Amino acid sequence: AFSAVGSLEGAYFKQFGKTVEFSEQQLVDCDKYSHACNGGLMTNGFIHWMRYAPRDESEYPYHIDPKSKCKEKQTSSNYEELRYGYRVDVGWECLYEALMHGPVSVAIRAENDEFRSYTGGIIDGDACGTDLDHGVTLVGYNADEDYWIVKNSWGEEWGENGYVRIRRGKDKGICGINQQNAQAVYNENEYVDFD
């Protein structure tokens, strides 16, 4: 949910010029194709927002409760439904191009010591693996030192104030970052199919 929300907030800002905080809890509670607190696919979140407009975080706040129920009917949305783009197995060049349109929701391999205990620096080894199990938000890159800048959902105490730097390149990418990604797009003219 956090990864998809990051991409959606970026797309909304690009289209409308307003900073918003959308509700992660809306997806956790209401996206019937995902698995609540046990995760799901970012594309399922985007599909949900195509049917039901996103809710504001202040109206539908995040809380940890595995028994939480969907409250979409009890809240209203001031936002438009979403148009979206979806990319799979596209490689680092296409991720770079997608970043020109805003933040990208990406899947990575996080269930490993290198990622879980990350405190700083650039992850550039094969210790991560490439079996995807976690969604994060790709927010930038450094061309000089050749790494991605990625926002995680584990709080500011983790990594570099909640962010991680991952080396670009390789087939599936370090921690599998090149394998699966999706990006929210509000404007039909912004949709680019990189497949």
Q: Language model features by range: what are they?
A:
Residues 1-195:
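Catalytic-core signature of thiol
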